[in-house]
Amino acid sequence: KDMLLFPGFAKSFHVVATPRGALRVAPVTMADVLVIQNKGGGHGEIGFHLAQQLVSRGDAVTILHEGDGPNPKEAHRAYGELPSDVKVIWGGDLSEAAACLAKLEGASFSSVVDNWSKSPEAIAPYATAAKAWGVSNYAYVSSAGMYTPNKGDYGAVGEECAVKSSGQRQAEEKIAEMGLPFSYFRPQYIYGPAQGKSYLAFFFDRITRGRPVPVPNGGDQLVTMTHAADNAAMIAAAVGNEAAVGEAFNCATPSLVTYDDLVRLCAGAAGMECEIAHYDPAGFDKPDG
């Protein structure tokens, strides 16, 4: 991995949705949706936007949230903006699935969006509950980090690309083996105004302090940056949508920028000039700490 930026930053491929994986928008029925939401990281803002979008079209939304309550992170502070009829249940340790499911007090749901599980062991009890409820769709948000393009390959990576057997890939396989009507969503780099983990904060920090921004190699590698609300819109389109069942979707914008251009966009947003310093990641020794 290349250092100083964010994991995988200097990889020379990006994900795009292929025609085979394009989400066909079909009429959807109103749903009772359970969103299983993690407490932060790159996925931390998705649940907020997803709840807003689902409620706006008439769905009922319950968020089973990791953690004991709101913390100072941006995504949690934004929850005050959610409609009052969005029910947020703080589940504590979601790996204690029996206790967390008991907090639902016997409620059942027609669709589940799992934005928390990262292993087959984690997803299994929630998938078992979903199967008992007879859900029309179990939308699982995994990661585009599972793709393993051939060494030397450049350009777009579609859903048919080979994947490694990561915990998230095994979770995908688990819900398929269980016979659930699944949809997989594989986001890459996510940003947004309430992001708990900002991939862009490093750039803004360097730019606003007048420091050079280190960019690996020549800076002409392409990357996708997708707004959390757009990720949520793709996922929301699958809820209650039979056309989405059994499909994997790259959850990323088709708009591509180079790493150098991404730094310049950040500088423009900050109203400042920027200096880019290219470096060879292969010859860089990461300091300890």
Name every feature range the model reports, one short phrase each.
Residues 206-226, 238:
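A conserved pocket-lining segment of Rossmann-fold NAD(P)-dependent short-chain dehydrogenase/reductase
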Residues 185-204, 221:
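Flexible, glycine-rich beta-alpha linker
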Residues 28-111, 180:
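N-terminal Rossmann/SDR dinucleotide-binding element
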Residues 232, 237-289:
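Mid/C-terminal beta-alpha module of Rossmann-like enzyme folds, strongest
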Residues 1-23:
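N-terminal chloroplast transit peptides
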Residues 44, 153-173, 197-201, 224-225, ...:
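Short-chain dehydrogenase/reductase
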Residues 124-178, 183-184:
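Conserved Rossmann-fold NAD(P)-dependent oxidoreductase catalytic core, especially the SDR/UDP-sugar
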Residues 109-115, 139:
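N-terminal Rossmann-like NAD(P) cofactor-binding module of classical short-chain dehydrogenase/reductase
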